[in-house]
């Protein structure tokens, strides 16, 4: 699926989501790629079983035009946020992501936008990219995952090695200058309480917000 909606941990095609509930506002999720530069041990790519009709695995990466076609058909009276989040890392398709954010801000300026990211976009592109999101993005949700570089690498198996951890934190600080809401996340069942508290301390020291998110199955 290129675009989808979520309820109770299940992914639905937009038309099916609306058929089941034509009243409640919800997010519209955008799936741009299967590619990811991390290989997290807890990733849904490994653990979640999905029917073919509701799978997030893409046969190919959609073009900007194909995503916009999906946007044009979306039930905007029900949408309260647009979230770029799939089985891959959205910032690996940075130019397409930015073009779609520009389209959304022009056509639906009151709808908040969010990108769920591993925070390694500056490593992937070899430059600072935070300023690219200025005026386009309302929330950046960045996966913190751990309180140390070593534990981070054990969990994420990042293609960039242990240095990915500090790069992710620096990216979060860069994003604070251009994006109103920057949130770092960790997964509850993956981390014991003392590790979660250490992550809180790291976020406090860098003036960043932490969200503990539930493990999805």
Residue ranges of predicted features:
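N-terminal [4Fe-4S]-dependent radical SAM core
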Residues: 1-34, 41-59, 76-78
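Short, conserved beta-strand segments within well-ordered enzyme catalytic domains
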Residues: 29-31, 81-85, 114
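Short Fe-S-cluster ligation motifs
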Residues: 64-87
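Conserved AdoMet/S-adenosylmethionine-binding subsite of the radical SAM
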Residues: 90-217
